[in-house]
Swiss-Prot record:
It is found in: Cytoplasm. One of its GO terms (cellular component) is cytosol. Its EC number is 6.1.1.1. This is Tyrosine--tRNA ligase. GO terms for molecular function: ATP binding; RNA binding; tyrosine-tRNA ligase activity. A motif ('HIGH' region) lies at residues 46-55. HAMAP family: Tyr_tRNA_synth_type1. It is an enzyme of class 6 (ligase). Belongs to the class-I aminoacyl-tRNA synthetase family. TyrS type 1 subfamily. L-tyrosine binds at Y41, Y176, Q180. Catalyzes the attachment of tyrosine to tRNA(Tyr) in a two-step reaction: tyrosine is first activated by ATP to form Tyr-AMP and then transferred to the acceptor end of tRNA(Tyr).
Length: 471
């Protein structure tokens, strides 16, 4: 079956990638986006010190539009962040002015990494506090409030959900949609911005801005919303064990970030490739085919995880994550192909000296995408400090070097019982420092290199379950 043709229209590209679920007139939007460059915007409220992967989906829509020649405005809500967008779960906690403005600066710095601020399609960063800090209560009521009808405001999904709850909604959060509408109008006046994008959960606020511009300026502007990302099991995408997956490496390490995408459910892969990568349509279809025909190889998962990690944390860090996977998992699987000569985890691997462990790849090319896998050429250094930092992120325990491997497996949670540990060892599914454990009565010290600068060992169950022990 031949690959489908690539998409030439940016609007059709957005539709194919599943990035539009609600919009103003689609015919007008297609004409707008497939025509001369326009200004468009997306807003991000500073509710935390970092953006997360849900925000990344919106940022990448901005980048796709910028690559098509359109000029993005990234708005960080220094004023709306002080108020809080109503959410079904209840009233948001109000943060101090100082805290919110600190988060504004952090989010602006993050956004600056993903957009191009030079050239004909140069992006602009704005803070809505700049035009709301001098707005008086009387001006708010006279110049803005009179254009909003309470009946219409009550019908917005977020407001309606809160009104049906026992807690209700405060006037503070009820007014949020007016402030967001003001943002769109201000950007229309200052930059001739004619398009707002955002998540579908913001659609009520977005259309309020469209209506405000029509009423006050007599102009027609446009908007579209993208679907909220959920995992195949219905859970909110971007959460793991209740914690958000942040773009800040200090909040979610590059290793954990990579593992989050690597461990995506097979059913989620086609959509995640469309949303989070810049792979072409034919490349994505090749990867989807690999999931159907050889799911155990997890080729598409590896491409997804590597590509997004590289995008967020840079090529050098993404390469270190990939090489660390090759060392820790022992068989080169992180590269999508089995390699020979991968090192035993020993004193050199975790040494803190100027020397580094190296992996000699067997392939002669490297590209971020290839049908066979993410590939490296030549000899690549593995930063031992990076490897050491990963040990403390893994499930871990302090043990004695004279403990039985079976007892350790149970202690670190790789096995639920001693009988399970013995069974897995007899089946050849347990490794210590990349050495297969063959005897159920083996002790930890028979696998150790005591010259290591950190007294640690890495246990692996099967292909992907790791734990660290310190002795």
């Amino acid at each position: 079956m031949p690959n489908a043709p690539e998409v030439n229209s940016v609007w059709d590209e957005l539709l194919w990638r599943g990035l539009v679920c609600v919009s103003t007139d689609q015919g007008a939007l297609k004409e707008l986006l497939d025509g001369p460059p326009i200004r468009f915007y997306c807003g991000f409220d500073p509710t935390a010190p970092s953006l997360h992967v849900g925000n990344l989906a919106q940022i990448l829509i901005m980048r796709r539009l910028q690559l098509a020649g359109h000029r993005p405005i990234a708005l960080v809500g220094g004023s709306t962040g002080l108020i809080g967008d109503p959410r079904p779960g209840g009233e948001r906690q109000l943060h101090s002015h100082e805290q919110v403005q600190e988060w504004v600066r952090a989010l602006q710095q993050q956004l600056s990494r993903f957009l191009d601020f030079k050239g004909a399609a140069a992006a602009v960063l704005v803070n809505n506090l700049d035009w709301t800090k001098s707005l008086t209560a009387l001006d708010f009521l006279r110049e803005l409030g009179k254009h909003f009808r309470v009946n219409a405001m009550l019908k917005k999904d977020a407001v309606a959900a809160r009104l049906s709850s026992t807690e209700g909604i405060s006037y503070t959060e009820f007014s949020y949609q007016i402030l967001q509408s003001l943002d769109f109008r201000q950007l229309y006046l200052d930059y001739k911005c004619v398009l707002q994008i955002g998540g579908s959960d913001q659609w009520g606020n977005i259309t309020s801005g469209v209506d405000l511009i029509r009423k006050t300026e007599g102009a027609g502007v446009h908007a579209f919303g993208s679907p909220l990302l959920t995992a195949s099991d219905g859970s909110k995408f971007g959460k793991t064990e209740g914690n958000a997956i942040w773009l800040d490496a200090d909040l979610t390490s590059p290793w954990s970030f990579y593992q989050f995408f690597l461990n995506s459910d097979d059913a989620d892969i086609p959509r995640l490739l469309r949303v989070f990568t810049f792979f072409t349509r034919s490349e994505i279809e090749d990867l989807n085919r690999s999931v159907r025909e050889n799911a155990s190889a997890r080729l598409a998962h590896r491409h997804l995880a590597y590509s997004v990690t590289r995008l967020v944390h840079g090529a050098d860090v993404a390469d270190q994550v990939l090489l660390a996977c090759s060392v820790l998992f022992g068989d080169g699987g992180a590269l999508g192909k089995t390699q020979t000569g991968l090192p035993r985890i020993d004193s050199d691997t975790l040494n803190d000296s100027s020397g580094v462990t190296t992996i000699k790849a067997q392939d002669n090319t490297y590209t971020p995408y290839s049908p066979e896998g993410v590939r490296f050429a030549g000899t690549f250094p593995v930063d031992p400090r990076f490897l050491r930092s990963i040990l403390f992120e893994l499930p871990n325990a302090t043990v004695s070097a004279h403990d039985l491997i079976t007892h350790i497996l149970q202690k670190v949670g790789l096995c639920r019982s001693l009988s399970e540990a013995r069974r897995l060892i007899s089946q050849g599914g347990i490794y210590v420092n990349n050495i297969k454990v063959t005897c159920p009565d083996a002790l930890l010290d028979s696998f150790l290199d005591n010259s290591m600068p950190i007294r640690a060992a890495i246990l692996r169950k099967g292909k992907k379950h790791l734990a660290a022990v310190f002795y």
